[in-house]
Amino acid sequence: MAIERTLSIIKPDAVAKNVIGKIYDRFESAGLKIIASRMAHLSQNEAEQFYGVHKDRPFFKDLVSFMISGPVMIQVLQGEGAIAKNRDLMGATDPKKADKGTIRADFADSIDANAVHGSDAPETAAVEVAFFFPGMNVFNR
């Protein structure tokens, strides 16, 4: 497997529950390195830009409102097969359908307040990482 980078966001619901450290432990225990991180309170414009791919979907407005409702923790994860590994750690989008022991099964409340975001492909990962960490703000470890 190739070494990959992926973007991960710990969403406002999980930040409010004070489980950032528990989620970071899962990343690191799975062999993923956190190579960049920052806390941010997204503006409406930032959330609309980041989730722009969904702008014509019925849930777009609610997604943007949720993502600006409180601070988020944004990180870049690196490791072998990082994209798939992170998606496995996250679990299904709907926490009720997520496998036991996944981040969403353990920390999410609903399909909307589902604790985490993760890139779904190498192409989207590159775009998402560049969106939040432009230039030289990401470091190999």
Curated annotation (Swiss-Prot):
Its EC number is 2.7.4.6. InterPro entries: NDK-like_dom, NDK-like_dom_sf, Nucleoside_diP_kinase, Nucleoside_diP_kinase_AS. One of its GO terms (molecular function) is nucleoside diphosphate kinase activity. The active site is at H117. Transmembrane segments: none annotated. PROSITE patterns: NDPK (PS00469), NDPK_LIKE (PS51374). It holds the Pfam family NDK. It is an enzyme of class 2 (transferase). It is found in: Cytoplasm. It catalyses: a 2'-deoxyribonucleoside 5'-diphosphate + ATP = a 2'-deoxyribonucleoside 5'-triphosphate + ADP; a ribonucleoside 5'-diphosphate + ATP = a ribonucleoside 5'-triphosphate + ADP. One of its GO terms (biological process) is CTP biosynthetic process. Gene3D superfamilies: Nucleoside diphosphate kinase-like domain. Major role in the synthesis of nucleoside triphosphates other than ATP. The ATP gamma phosphate is transferred to the NDP beta phosphate via a ping-pong mechanism, using a phosphorylated active-site intermediate. PANTHER family: NUCLEOSIDE DIPHOSPHATE KINASE, NUCLEOSIDE DIPHOSPHATE KINASE DDB_G0292928-RELATED. This is Nucleoside diphosphate kinase. It comes from Polynucleobacter asymbioticus (strain DSM 18221 / CIP 109841 / QLW-P1DMWA-1) (Polynucleobacter necessarius subsp. asymbioticus). The gene is ndk.
